[in-house]
């Protein structure tokens, strides 16, 4: 009963483009997804904190759902420590977007997209290697 009163409302999203552009991705799962980038905000869950990137995703052009990509500070700082530099905001966004594409490819159907996409340290390394970022 008190959970509703004690829970904090998430911060508003920042960084959304002035004009939303619908983009399309054909997943290896066989589904074609349309998505919009809605923005990002800090998140804190249990002992983990980082940045939440929110995308509005649809696979049928009729219904959509908000998909959160959670990039933990620990995963990003691990890469930064090993490479001796700080990731730019655009590189962090690229990691989130590529993690979203990976979820489109690996999850069996659009219904599975309702679960958060978690970015691990190994994901950060693999994504940045694929993008040619050192």
Task: Report the location of each language-model feature.
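Extended, alpha-helix-rich binding/interface surfaces that flank or overlap catalytic cores
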Residues: 1-134
